[in-house]
Curated annotation (Swiss-Prot):
One of its GO terms (biological process) is adenylate cyclase-modulating G protein-coupled receptor signaling pathway. It is found in: Nucleus; Cytoplasm; Cell membrane; Cytoplasm, Cytoskeleton, Microtubule organizing center, Centrosome. It catalyses: GTP + H2O = GDP + phosphate + H(+). It comes from Oryzias latipes. This is Guanine nucleotide-binding protein G(i) subunit alpha-1.
């Protein structure tokens, strides 16, 4: 009776080694795959973050892809000026120059008859004259009292360029476009040897029931908050302040039993708009108990505390907060680099890969 292995035993041993090797490879592959769930109330900047991932981690938008956004740029621009003109009626604001009333009538006629993806010289002229009117500007300065696209001034101030016959949207123009996200948008990219799958979920509450099957096995949640929402009402629920709506949603996500082991990254977004607004619109609109100054630093720190205090598991769960401007590529690049390091530290060190 010798100790030599039979041919069958050797084959079995080889098979066993191969299975172990495959399992190890699969384990490494799984460890390198990062699932990110982007959550937040409507218009908090989630889709802009996704666009930035394409710009930062892929080749960005090709000229052909940029051209496809032309119709959206025009639609956003036209809808913005229409929203302001309609709000003037509700807020009882008159045109500084009464001749603009004819332009307003013309705007509605031309907007209804212009082919999608085109901006005629006549329509551009009407919009330009309206935008320069003192009454229109007065109404624009009260935009917290009605729903207006954040990019309204960006496009309207640049009407000469975007209405030009040879206009092709820039990457920044594309970043500023607003199209309501419905359903789930999945984006894949590689960064720091990790394979990211990012899921952008429709922000409006009517869409939230669609999130559920995205949750399983998610590595981290990036929760976006529009800081500038503190003095707005929400489109779907005129009774609830936008910031309170975000806090309510964050509470339900942060303390959800499914996310006990999930890293929660909080993006307090639109910091640029917040910095402008806080000079003239008091934080007490949203937080009556706030007794601090209306400086950006103090007000922003207070909002951060309000969100972080919602975490009921402070002893075991850390919230990683970043102030962001989703339309600023350098800022998003810097923040996402820090976010990736947190993901590596929290989720991947155990595998011995990093």
């Amino acid at each position: 009776m010798g100790c030599t292995l039979s041919t069958d035993d050797k084959a079995a041993q080889e098979r066993s080694k191969m299975i172990d090797r495959n399992l190890r490879d699969d384990g490494e592959k799984a460890a390198r795959e990062v699932k990110l769930l982007l959550l937040g109330a409507g218009e908090s900047g989630k889709s802009t973050i996704v666009k930035q991932m394409k710009i930062i981690h892929e080749a960005g938008y090709s000229e052909e892809e940029c051209k496809q956004y032309k119709a959206v740029v025009y639609s956003n621009t036209i809808q913005s000026i229409i929203a302001i003109i309609r709000a003037m009626g509700r807020l009882k604001i008159d045109f500084a120059d009464q001749a603009r009333a004819d332009d307003a009538r013309q705007l509605f006629i031309l907007a209804g008859s212009t082919e999608e993806g085109f901006m005629t010289g006549e329509l551009a002229g009407v919009i330009q004259r309206l935008w320069k009117d003192g009454g229109v500007q007065a109404c624009f300065s009260r935009s917290r009292e009605y729903q207006l696209n954040d990019s309204a001034a960006y496009y309207l101030n640049d009407l000469d360029r975007i209405s030009h016959a040879s206009y092709v949207p820039t990457q920044q123009d594309v970043l500023r476009t607003r199209v309501k996200t419905t359903g789930i948008v999945e984006t894949h990219f590689t960064f720091k040897d990790l394979h990211f799958k990012m899921f952008d979920v429709g922000g409006q509450r009517s869409e939230r029931k669609k999130w559920i099957h995205c949750f399983e096995g998610v590595t981290a949640i990036i929760f976006c908050v529009a800081l500038s929402d503190y003095d707005l009402v929400l489109a779907e629920d005129e009774e609830m302040n936008g910031m309170h709506e975000s806090m309510k949603l964050f509470d339900s996500i942060c303390n959800n039993k499914w996310f006990t082991d999930t890293s929660i990254i909080l993006f307090l977004n639109k910091k640029d708009l917040f910095e402008e607004k806080i000079k003239k619109s008091l934080l007490t609109i949203c937080f009556p108990e706030y007794a601090g100054s209306n400086t950006y630093e103090e007000a922003a720190a207070y909002v951060q505390c309000q969100f972080e205090d919602l975490n009921k598991r402070k002893d075991t769960k850390e919230i990683y907060t970043h102030f962001t401007c989703a339309t600023d590529t350098k800022n998003v690049q810097f923040v996402f680099d820090a976010v990736t390091d947190v993901i590596i530290k929290n989720n991947l060190k155990d595998c011995g890969l990093f």
